């Protein structure tokens, strides 16, 4: 019977077999595009065979299956359908299929408490079906989930498995497993509001069985468990095999030292692992008492671990830490989300609007309280309580996503790591050949069979360097430490090397390229059909709709008598002089409730048609990046009806206004300000035919408020470039790294900023792409519009920086709507656009993520730098995401910089290049060290001797370990260059270097051997006595002395500095180690002294021969450095001359070459259909 393997695609949410690893914060960040499940169940005969094999082979199969669980599963169990599976094998592949992960999990069963999953009567469908599971979604999607609960209740058993903290339940109707977070997929905002009456105890118990407890559990293993895991690691397994072999070969001191070092290493690893687990557990541990609603108006205090999706929380006014993800359904909250997004500014959360739209935590993040965030203040307006409905719990929450990303980082597909595994495999083959050679030689020398076996196996421990993984890890640890000292924190050290391969970096604009704060330049009022000149001080405006809109159209709140909120809103309100207060305004009806009150300044202008009075905000629709606008509904004492004000992007607000209220020169005036780099916000308003009360205003929908508005004017704000921006951009461009701006701001403003900072040079062409959707029988069309090359920023000519024109016909700029049209209607043109586009404006957060993914499909190594607010998805999807934040770690990116500028980007790239180049050097050195010792042992095996016990100890621990650790300390080069470190280990330069250096090493050792046996005073060793009993002898002394120098020479030769690292002389500890060890080796040759006896060296009395040995060392030193120098300087040119230039394997390079030969678009251009 064949295994039932279900291929589940991650791009189809309705499919319940989908394994989606995204969280509510970042649903698009999953690297998995396909997941395959294979089911297995028990087989008595297979189990008997398995246990028999384990017992007969002394547990070796058990150890092997521990390292390769899939082999054990296939041997013990038989394939079966997923419906009957007891064990699952899960295969996860990324989008490009370059990385593959295998997991083995057990299917668990749990009894379901008999109970109803139906919502209160007002939430039930007409036929009485429950909507609690997923809400009402199109077609019959919710029916499958409802059927799940009915089936499971009938059988009173639930089948599920847990992978990386996420729970997946069996869907009988779909015959697949479904992630529990998808059970609520399709729930509408109306469904969420219907849950505000709470769950019954039976419903809560049943849901807890399905969803699991609301805890983010960090497994903390005991020291005994950790010891078993560490000791049974393949690395330590190889060490144990080697130690046993050395003991059998009478290498007691060496075996004892390696054992002690391994034991200390294990103990340190156990302590560090357990300490990290305990620290992380203490950080994420959250257990608080919360108040929940029950049907019938009852309230109950429960532990936060008991919460399930559908519970309704009563939030205290003093706030606290959120124990789950929840949708706010009544009241408002001021929240600090810095622990997740890195955004230090408190955020105002308002009640989720009712309606048939599907609820999505990302889309409705302004109405969602995320787990782990701190509620600073909660206020109720309609009703006595602030209510929030639980939407996600445990690892499905935002905090759970952060913890999961730390515990289970996304696998990295890196050519260097793949090649290193292949190289180790090649060394293993070489060890096998050496083993065969040694067996033949030792047999000819009539060595006993026991000795032949031990010596042959000993070669394996020589050729395959067991310390290689540790040496490679040291490289990234040094880089991580250097980054930390510069205020850059990294939670995924393996991504440091990826920083060295960056080809393109995307930047957010506001707060990243430009200053975070905005200065109000003035207001452009609208009078009739004419936009008046700029009024520099809005506080001098006459009292009217425009001034009231400026004073009230914001999401500010008061915390401890201090206004908090978006910096732009704070500046706008500050420019009016109005003061924020909370509570009813003076003169309001008794008992009336309002959100906030804006009070006019006491000493305002006297020339007013009516005296200034406080204005109360009745309703707010917060700003949405997707909608690009926010709305408020206000009233004031004496007003007969409230007014609505809208603030947002000029183009969008104008489209919401009645055409007769938008002046004919609106576009020209707007362009005059945006072309100068100013940020422009439009304001509009209208009276509302409702009662001026909070209750009436809260019933309004956003569509009602935003219909048939009247334009009021424009708010012009100045957003200066940060002083570090232009130099950093020029540095990146000079080194061949593309820079791209991805912003939600106006296209013209973004283009101006791009020219001002040097992304687009003064002499470079730029064209704007404008796309139109297909309509009225006309197909979608693209239009390319050339722009002027003047770079004026905020009214002043930008500082000029020399730019290096990029190899492309022209720069392109486009908006988010155009990007959407390109993806949908012009997929073949999209790659051509992406390799030339420099400015992406009016991009929604999800479009930023899509852009990063599209660039990665062109095989760019993509970096993303942003402030972590609207860039969460893009920062996490990028190969190297850098969040500008004061927090040490955030959910949004592997790198977090406390620097408030993009200077961190070149720093990460320099450290990445240094780390990658160092990794190559360390790998080469460890390989050369193994091969050098391999050659020494083979030479000595040939004459029936070997290196001594303490000689191995001196080479492996004193010499090699010291230089391997210290050579990684060299810091990065101070400047970036156009060259990039190699990414492929199996390349001609690397392999050529290894082969030539090994040939030189072998030649020197053989030369020394033949020189010593040619001396008249030479006495050959007694070949009838096996090693190490035939020590000391001349042959061993010469080979050991020469090889000792070779380890130092090779370490220095492969530790070149430029262009990615600082010069060798800057690494003082490394130079001191080389000098000291070299001096000791020189002393061993010239004046052996006290070390001669313990090391088993024979005294050479011929002074001229000693100098001859040092001459060989000097020749080896010069030859090694000459080889590296010639290979670096001449080999690339020779390879280009010998072999014809081939097309690049990277798609973006092929496109650039094509565009260089056939420029596109050709300016001036028209439309493309």
From Swiss-Prot:
It catalyses: spermidine(out) + ATP + H2O = spermidine(in) + ADP + phosphate + H(+); spermine(out) + ATP + H2O = spermine(in) + ADP + phosphate + H(+). Accumulates in an inactive autophosphorylated state. The presence of spermine results in a dose-dependent reduction in autophosphorylation. Its main location: membrane. Glycans are attached at residue 1022. It is an enzyme of class 7 (translocase). It comes from the Eukaryota. Keywords: ATP-binding, Cytoplasmic vesicle, Endosome, Glycoprotein, Lysosome, Magnesium, Membrane, Metal-binding, Nucleotide-binding, Phosphoprotein, Translocase, Transmembrane, Transmembrane helix, Transport. The chain crosses the membrane at residues 226-246, 251-271, 423-443, 459-479, 920-940, 947-967, 994-1014, 1038-1058, 1070-1090, 1107-1127. One of its GO terms (molecular function) is phosphatidic acid binding. Residues 1-44, 66-225, 272-422, 480-919, 968-993, 1059-1069, 1128-1169 are cytoplasmic. Gene3D superfamilies: Calcium-transporting ATPase, cytoplasmic domain N (3.40.1110.10), Calcium-transporting ATPase, cytoplasmic transduction domain A (2.70.150.10), Calcium-transporting ATPase, transmembrane domain (1.20.1110.10), HAD superfamily/HAD-like (3.40.50.1000). Mg(2+) binds at residues 867, 871. Belongs to the cation transport ATPase (P-type) (TC 3.A.3) family. Type V subfamily. Interacts with MYCBP2; the interaction inhibits the ubiquitination of TSC2 by MYCBP2. Interacts with HDAC6; the interaction results in recruitment of HDAC6 to lysosomes to promote CTTN deacetylation. This is Polyamine-transporting ATPase 13A2. The lineage of its organism: Eukaryota, Metazoa, Chordata, Craniata, Vertebrata. The gene is Atp13a2.
